[in-house]
Amino acid sequence: MYDYGTFTFESKAEVLDKAKTFWNPDKTQFWTDTGVDLVIDRREGYFLWDMGGRRLIDLHLNGGTYNLGHRNPEVMQAITEGMEHFDVGNHHFPSVARTALAQRLVETAPASITKVAYGSGGGEAIDIALKSARHATKRRKIVSIVKAYHGHTGLAVATGDDRFAKFFLADQPDEFLQVPFNDIEAMERVLAPGDVAGVIMETIPATYGFPLPAPGYLEAVKAITEKHGTLYIADEVQTGLMRTGELWCITKHGIEPDILVTGKGLSGGMYPITAALLSDRAAKWLDEDGFGHISTFGGAELGCVAALKTLEISTRPEVRSMVHYIADIFDQGLQRIQADHPDWFVGIRQNGVVIGLEFDHPEGAKFVMRELYENGVWAIFSTLDPRVLQFKPGLLLSRELCEDVLDRLAVAVARAETVVRGRKAS
């Protein structure tokens, strides 16, 4: 019997069966068929325990939600203490928690940012960003990159790959245009007519497998947006909050975006909260009609408490130093592993602890993912480029755990290569 206080289950098998009945049959079956029949029970730091008792090192982190680890003690303490004063709050009125977080976000953001609008999920924050761009420019078209992913809400999903954008028959698809990543000429062509409200890009596109921007590419895109009166929207949901060794990855490029979107890790992994950080131009609607976007749970006060503590931890000098230290360990270790498998392990895409590992097979990352799972590590393939494994170490990993992960990865890469080469031979 598994007793969780307000509910119980007899077994893992019962959970899987009822998940297919009452929750999501296709996704549950997909993971079972893939060999990852994971039902998370206990979780602590950078470890997960399956209901069967097996421990996994978490290198997925739910897209960076658990940058600081699962159930981070400092974040939990902040929320516990916050519950003495706060709850969700009332979204209509000024709030000490929302105001304190908004001020801190503006203080830590690029100089262009002056206001904050809150959401409860990343897609909602993206929707706020796109609506803000449309209001500011009085234009409707939005440009994103091919293989983009910015969430699953109404406007956000329309910016993404057709797999998701067309699934629910997205409205007015002609208003959402896509160009290849790192193709500056294509970006110039699509913006030249002067009818685009905003360009939205992840600074390093996560679901596309973390391809790195070519030198000067993002800077050139920003210059083109300024030339044509288009807003530049930096989606930092997965690349922000110190994952690249800077609080916001976009600042490494010297870019001051018109809008910056943050989420996932902002929650400390404990209470949902996201935000669209707006420049004066993008925030005009807040002066004209502050009821233009209403979100009951956007900027929930307990979420603000969690986010403030998360920002405080993430901006500590020792955490910044730790990220660079961890990145160096993995840089050296990954190169050693790649040298042993040069025809199989063909690419390392790394900026800080934002890492993608590329393999020589159309779905190579799925094979490595499965072998890693069997060897006690959870990392996920890139949905829109399954050649690439998303490999996302936490910000506070110990050297010992880094080396443990590298040892397990070396075994998994070798085993996956044997499986794939064996299939090709047969």
Where are these regions (language model features)?
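Conserved N-terminal phosphate-binding loop of PLP-dependent enzymes in the Aspartate aminotransferase
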Residues: 1-426
